[in-house]
Amino acid sequence: VGQPYMNNLLDKIFFRSQNLNYIKFGFRNIKKNTEVKQIFNAIHSFSKNSEIRYVGGCVRKIINRETVDDIDLAVNLKPKDVCDALNKKNIKYYESGIEHGTITALIDNTKFEITSLRKDVDTDGRHANVEFSDNWKEDASRRDFTINAIYADIEGSLFDPFDGKKDLENGKVNFIGDIEVRIKEDYLRVLRYIRFFLNYSK
């Protein structure tokens, strides 16, 4: 029996390519991390409507079955509310980029970047003036690539409005929206595209 046949058989047995079970398994492994639990609990306990999801590199790595070495999080709370939520649970943090909605929580020397949902008001080719939002699709729309706009809740259920998972699995690095417009918003996206292409293209 050849190796391709065995790989296909293993895929079928363990659902590795047919559904999202392996993704949920990956996020449930992260969930075992005490520090991660503390962050999620702090946000969820702040209000009945507060939501927090994984985003960015850690989601891509789980989908690609790679080791997760850092965790970025997105929340539907404004930065001040994130600070209040962390304070209530005695979690240390610093305002690493609060003008852009980013708070860095620090637990046992482990850093977690927590960023509020945003929408761009205007851009100048490098920086954007933002407003904070509670709309996940709106936040996803301002991101550069489809593979950078995949979110996952603590159980591993994906919010993937631009089919980034499919692009990631197919080795595609696609811009969200009009390429020319997105590059004019931030010219460094050209360099980011090259880096992502080298890392993820097939």
Which residue ranges define each predicted feature?
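Catalytic cores of the polymerase beta-like nucleotidyltransferase superfamily
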Residues: 2-202
